[in-house]
Design a protein with these regions (language model features):
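Short, basic/aromatic recognition patches that contact phosphate-bearing ligands
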Residues: 1-72
Length: 72
């Protein structure tokens, strides 16, 4: 079985993002990108992956927007 070299890092990052979202009410993609030392586009792809996995992630654009876990 061939394993993607980036897979372990991505899994660690996804878990890290989820941890941040559970601890903070709201964060922005630039904040996450800086924390995990990746691009904003990578964070956006990671958020899409979390959503596809059934994690209720909500993104709001514009002033006062950000990324959060849906309550409820």
């Amino acid at each position: 079985m061939v394993m993607n070299k980036g897979a372990p890092m991505k899994i660690d990052r996804l878990i890290g993002i989820l941890s941040v979202l559970l601890q903070e009410e709201k964060v922005t993609a630039p904040q996450l990108a800086e924390k995990f030392e990746v691009s904003r586009r990578t964070i956006n792809r990671d958020i899409e992956d979390l959503c596809r996995a059934g994690i209720p992630v909500v993104t709001l654009q514009g002033a006062g927007g950000g990324i959060s876990i849906m309550n409820g």
